[in-house]
Structures are given as C-alpha cells and as structure tokens.
Amino acid sequence: GNKLLAHKLKDVTADDPEELREITTMLVNARTLLRKRQMSMRHLAELYDAIKYVDYDESRLVDISKDMKLRKFLRRMLQVLADEVYLEEGFMPDNPLNDSGERTIKSRLLIS
C-alpha cells in the first residue's frame, strides 16, 4: 500500500519542483488521514496555506492529481477548503466538487 504509493509519487513528480511534490504529498497524506479519521483542522490549515500562498504550477498539479488518481479527492478538498476556511476560487487549481464524497470528508474531519 503506502510504499507503492510513495514510489508512484516519486516517479510521477520526479521532474517537478519541490513545491509541487510537497503539495501532492500533503494531498496523499490527507487522504490517508481521512481514511483513518485522523485529519485535523491543523492539517486542513496547512493544506490551505500551501494552496493559497505557495507559488506552483496549478495545471501541473491537476495533471499530477490525475496520474495519482487523486483528482476527485483534490476537487473535493477544494470544496472543503472553500466551506471550512474560505479558500477563494481564484486560488483553486481545479474546480471544487460538492458531492457525497465531499460530505463524507467533512464528516470525518476532526473539528476541535
């Protein structure tokens, strides 16, 4: 599981700048934490900071998310970021997705 994912992440992002590798890693980790019901608002805030303030190639992030089979998750997380911490659309690398998967993410967030 996780070792394969780490190798795939390394292969897919081998030629990408560090910023893109970091954001992609954050997304992979967020998905894992959510599956274990261990994602906190702090994790969400860190993802928000990265997406909003780090200078990265947004279209490349979308391509990476497709290669990593993370695109729907990325889009759902953008919706969560918009709803929970008010990420504006101008900072979103992709279209947010509001569906049952996004609501599941919200229900699994540890809001303390």
Residue positions per predicted region:
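Conserved NTP-donor binding/palm subdomain of two-metal-ion nucleotidyltransferases/polymerases, i.e.
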Residues: 1-112
